[in-house]
Amino acid sequence: MVPNTDLFYLSGIEQEESILVLFPSAEDERMREMLFLRETSELIAIWEGHKLTKPQATEVSGIRSVHWTADFPRTLHRLMCEAQSVWLNTNEHKRAVVEVESRDVRFIRDLRSRYPLHDFRRVAPLLHTLRVVKDPLEVDLIRHACSITKAGFERVCRFVEPGVNECDVEAEFAHEFIRRRGAFAYNPIIGAGRNSCVLHYLDNDQVCRSGDVLLLDVAASYANYNSDLTRTIPVSGRFTRRQRQVYDAVLRVLRASIAGLTPGKIWSQWQAEAEDLVARECVGLGLLKPKDLKVKVTDPSKKPVKKWFMHGNGHPIGLDVHDLGHMNQPFATGWVMTVEPAIYIPEEDLAVRLENDVLITENGPVDLMADIPIEAEEIEAMMK
């Protein structure tokens, strides 16, 4: 995991305590792109390992002007005397929970105190706009993460049987991911039976029993880029009739939701479409009545379908699992979105969630996980 994904996105540098300064209009060309790194020592090398040299940092980042962080205060003052506006970065991820004051916040406060007449602005909105659109190299890295995820999932399907523990399943994923130079993209969710109904179940310590479904929300990262996969499999190797009904219903919604990822559509519209699809499937499953489809509510969270499908249908993915992006902006070519419809039935100790990662293009959505088994027959065939 990189200390700062924004810094990595702009420079390729993933070393802690690094500073990037961009000043395109600086009079001195050497000050238009500058990278500041922590200077290493023999003691640091012994305790922490190798740190980048200046030439190595240039090779990684393409930035020629590399300095030690000890030089930063003096250089910053020189830049501030020339600059009028200063764009500063903070963690504005909508899912961020920051209870302790960060180094970024302390730096901003100090800078405002020393230079009160400068114009300070937020760089986060610009980075959100840039990062949500993936270039071909980024897409290739996500594809590779998906291929590692596929290997892990197929290994687990061959392993799972009644009596194994959820933690044993997690270990199988870990083995396959690490041997392929990947890592867990996020804390794995491996829930059998009733645990499948817990959206962010993380205990992963219960026995998988015959007749249970096993919900697997587990995926790999590679070179700091993430994938995000969910599959639901039968512990005994075959779905019951009811499990198969729910499974096929969710799969139909997944297929339709993938097809609905088109440039120009707003996330809220896409979400509403998914909820309508799930609601109609819930009628067929006996979870809702036809009259429930006609209920009009001013608060979307009060829709009858929310009892069975209560979360978002997907999100951008990239350097962050829930990647940056303005969700009130239209989808555009280059976005990579997860698609993750579900139906949760706690009364039956049954939940099905399915999730693939999809690239939005002008010529239609491209499912980056199209080769990962998802049809019920495919799952059962692998588990024989």
Which role fits each region the language model picked out?
Residues 1-384:
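Active-site neighborhoods and metal-handling regions in enzymes and metal-associated proteins
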